[in-house]
Amino acid sequence: MSTHVRHPIWLPALRPADARTFASLYAVESFARATISSVIPIQAYEILHNEQIVSILYTIVSLLGLSVTLFMPMLIRRFARRWVYTAGCLMLAIGSVFFVTHTLPGQLAGMCRVMGASALSITLNLYIMDHIRKTDFMQAESLRMAWSMFAWTGGPTLGIFLYTRFGIYAANGAVVAFALPLLALFWTYRLGDNPSIRPGKSRPINPLANIGRFVAQPRLRLAWLIAFGRSCFWTTFFVYGPLFM
């Protein structure tokens, strides 16, 4: 009797992506972003010694991030979502490497991690729309915001603690410690595009062509104003709070 028997290899079966899947991804991502959010303005002020120049630096980086966000659909069509998400995780980690140089060019390059955050946000929202049913969307978003609350509540405090007690390497090392597990978690979930959703045959090449259609709809304008106002508040809080405390 033959003793060489090939037994089947049992691959781990993953359950379909649900609300907890995206809540866990967003929570780890939030920790990677929130931990350093309160340290960046302090480090920029230590380099520039002027609050106004720090504001100008943030404005320049924000405009660069906005330009990349507008062209993110082109990148997704060219390289696929999973690779754009992967690039976003790596940009968070690489940005921290630039921060530890404690120089103005390194600060500017590190703050460009906002492009990675944009890639993560857009691709994650696309995955959510593919895998979460419309009837479950409210519950999924509530769970996602609730889990990220822990990151944005404790993350900035953790970053300041590490920066003041253990130095710049510890604060930025925490970002890498969250960004790399985020990448591993994403590939563990094996998220893919919903095969039942097919892209349209005619797609605008220029993303700016859709701005007029967006502005023409009152509900979209209101949603944008709410999101923009909230973003302005929290950005002001995280940037100027550490500077003037």
Region locations from a protein language model:
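Helix-to-loop junctions at the C-terminal end of transmembrane segments
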Residues: 68-80, 163
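Structural signature of the two symmetry-related core transmembrane helices
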Residues: 83-97, 176
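Cytoplasmic helix-loop-helix junction between adjacent transmembrane helices
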Residues: 113-148
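Juxtamembrane intracellular "pre-TM" segments in multi-pass secondary transporters
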Residues: 2-19, 191-226
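Helix-loop boundary and gating motifs at the non-cytosolic
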Residues: 5-62, 221-227, 231-245
